[in-house]
Each structure stands twice: as structure tokens, then as C-alpha cells.
Amino acid sequence: GILDSLKNLAKNAGQILLNKASCKLSGQC
């Protein structure tokens, strides 16, 4: 349903933000 879609979008966005943050912290961007 719509709620599941929103949850998946939020999870995906969270993963992308975590990846960007971790690559900046490690200097590997």
C-alpha cells in the first residue's frame, strides 16, 4: 500500500544519506 511505499522511500533515502555521510567522513568520495 501507500504506507509501505513511503516506508521504502524513506528507507532508501536514509541509506543514501548514510552512504554520503560515511564517504565524507572516510574521505573516499
Curated annotation (Swiss-Prot):
Keywords: Amphibian defense peptide, Antibiotic, Antimicrobial, Cytolysis, Disulfide bond, Hemolysis, Secreted. Pfam families: Antimicrobial_2. InterPro entries: Antimicrobial_frog_2 (IPR012521). Expressed by the skin glands. It comes from the Eukaryota. It is found in: Secreted. GO terms for biological process: defense response to bacterium; killing of cells of another organism. Its main location: secreted. Transmembrane segments: none annotated. Shows antibacterial activity against representative Gram-negative and Gram-positive bacterial species, and hemolytic activity. This is Brevinin-2Ed. It comes from Pelophylax lessonae.
